[in-house]
Amino acid sequence: VANDKIIIHGARAHNLKNIDVKIPKNKLVVITGLSGSGKSSLAFDTLYAEGQRRYVESLSAYARQFLGQMDKPDVDSIDGLSPAISIDQKTTSHNPRSTVGTVTEINDFLRLLWARVGTPICPNDHIPISSQSPDQMVDRVLELSERTRLQILSPVVRDKRGIQKKVFEKIKKEGFVRVQVDGETYELDEVPELDKNKKHTVNVVIDRIIIKDGIRSRLFDSFEAALRLSDGYAIADVIGGDSIPFSEKYACTICGFTVGELEPRLFSFNAPIGACPECEGLGSKLEVDVDLVVPDRTKTLREGAMIPWNPISSQYYPQLLEQFCEAAGINMDTPFNKLSKKQQQQVLYGNGDQTFHFHYENDFGGVRDVDVPFEGVINNIKRRYKETNSDFTREQMRKYMTELPCPACHGYRLNQRVLAVKINGQNIGEVSELPISKAITFFEGVQFSEQQEKIARPILKEILDRLTFMKNVGVEYLTLSRSARTLSGGEAQRIRLATQIGSNLSGVMYVLDEPSIGLHQRDNDRLISSLKAMRDLGNTLIVVEHDEDTMRAADYIVDIGPGAGANGGKVMAAGTPKQIMRSRKSLTGQYLSGKKMIEVPKERREGNGKHIILKGAAENNLKNINVDFPLGKFICVTGVSGSGKSTLVNVILKRILAQKLNNNSAKPGKYKSISGIRNIEKVINIDQSPIGRTPRSNPATYTGVFDDIRELFAQTNQAKMRGYNKGRFSFNVKGGRCEACHGDGIIKIEMNFLPDVYVPCEVCHGTRYNSETLEVEYKGKNISQVLNMTVSEALKFFSAIPKIKRKLQTIEDVGLGYVTLGQPATTLSGGEAQRMKLAAELHRQSRGKSFYILDEPTTGLHMDDIKRLLAVLQRLVDAGNTVLVIEHDLDVVKSADWLIDLGPEGGEAGGYIVATGTPEEVAKVKESYTGQYLKKMLERDKAL
């Protein structure tokens, strides 16, 4: 049947070579191949793009204009396509209001649960707050034994100062005769004069009643009168016994604290009715951080201790500070920490209303001569952040601010009314702070009355299902209140995956981009089971993946190759994992069958004997640990997801080194001390962010080789005769570039209701340069033709020019020989951008004292790419540098000289050092999950 396959004919997106592919439906299909071979072009730019486009095309033109345009992918035909949903690596929302709970929609169910079965508890008197109708009040009183005497009271004044004259007049008008004032009963005419400075309580006596048959309607009328007078409150005061307070609103019967009608939107921190008024539902407030304003307190004011006021473009603030200090008698040559407390406060927070004389002349002759109060550096930053219209200034001021938990709601984001509503003693904010594993325990053990149970059961099922899906994809250490913008790409993707599993759709084609990123081997098995569960609902899963376990678990594998870029784009093999392993053409198959492998290094380096020692690391979940980083080695930090690796390396170590060596202002996480920094000269973070934000940035400009190439062109005889310098060969400045397209080579034409069309510039035909510039040639090629060469081609072409050859060789060495010199930076994948940065580092003349940090460098890399990456990293270490990677990939882990394994679990149960040492030593540690998997791998490698 043709219906059980997706059949692609003639796919040509990017580097795909007009390929035909058949993919079985309702199966777990892995698309694999080298980085840059065309996997994403097939999965995302062909299959997903066409599935999405067909859906959008079926909508009206009016609806389409809101959905953004979908280009038709370059493919002849695709048959058997289902509606497509893509779950990719783009981190979710950057909106501070977006949390794990809102992204997964669990918050909607929590709000419903608390609104329907939550009990409000007064925060002042700690008694349950409920609301009763007059009928319920009558029923409660009729439960008292017969002949009980009581009076129905209406509390009109509670604990208020004043003589309450108007209140008594109103009561008299209503026709009542008795009142209770501060516990004593009086006739209205005999009430003594009240002390206006004391607090008083006034209750109107509505009726005096003895419980007997036939009293119901009289009681009902009395309660109605009481509720009307006091705006919703009544008291049944048993003579010689207790009094029973009633309220028809959700309000405390003692202090009047009101919660109001419980409805789901009340529990949303994104609705004004529920949000904390202080922080407007953000849970944190931006405050100026003294440590960022004065990072080094041993400096004097004259040496620039106040970072924000150091001279940049004008001397205004330095002059202001100097003249204030003179007036206030503060010595600018005393280290800041040696100034008195009062003087430090004056500089930071100002001098109140006291004025001093300030004289200032700017560079343009403008003079300011005034008596002004001194507002203080911190108040100045606050004011400028609030008042400025300039984004630049706001961004500058933001650098000195830190988000602190809101003092009013303690970071729960909700107002006091909402936080008063509890289930099993917990409010919605407290439950959102629990790690998902603990939240599951809470909801499984929650106790309800019989009636509540009926209401809560369906809501609880939805909540527990969704929480369990999140546990199954390996993020049980996250909390629902965690801000979505602090999640890593892998976490964000797995959360969206859990949401999709929760939506229970079937007949959909899901396209996933490396869901195993950032997952430890241990958590991988659960992820694979989740993927299979989605498949079993009747969905097709197309997963772009390099992970060996996922490939072995797949129903079908498509291997794209043989190389990358222009050398890729063909189907090398397609079939079940067993068929792929037998294929001679498939590189992936050779690694899966063990014909090819990444060798374990023959020996582990001893290092240079020096260390960086970090003591008392305690940010997030780190348990006050001491970590020793031996220098001159290849170090790998491992541990299950959420064990604290990123906190240790990115939030603490990297920021300390960047602050001390690069004058960076990002504030490191909590730690006690660090030693050994003098043993390194610079810290270099090589991440997967793009090497340039615009299409004008490309590998040639980024690695600096383009400067050398332009220099070379300017040295040619033709260029010398015409008087061209190297600026003539730049497509970014006037002179040599084509002015019709400003050196872009393409022109964007906007079309309404249709996708924007990019056409080659008709003046320069996409070459970016004007015809005069293109007449200058080196070895028969002009500058535009050189930009269109791949790195491998250029390497042969410039083999006689050592300076150019060296830079190109390093790009070739990191496995990017297939990239063209002029390829726009925006089209490089994260893995390619990271390796481009490595290449740029490799050709810098290193003095062997650099400290490189890489966070999961194997993202997007095939086993064969990893082999190359490792060779490059080992070269950096051989030159005497230190390389520190955070990594789960066992091929990288087994190749390191030194491992630091954190754990044992993720979240609260993590943050300890489980093992350190060489891979062989860590493999012997039974408590280490990494060690267990490493042991299997090292044994398997020996067997092969």
Report residues per predicted region.
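Conserved phosphate-binding elements of NTP-dependent enzyme cores
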Residues: 1-944
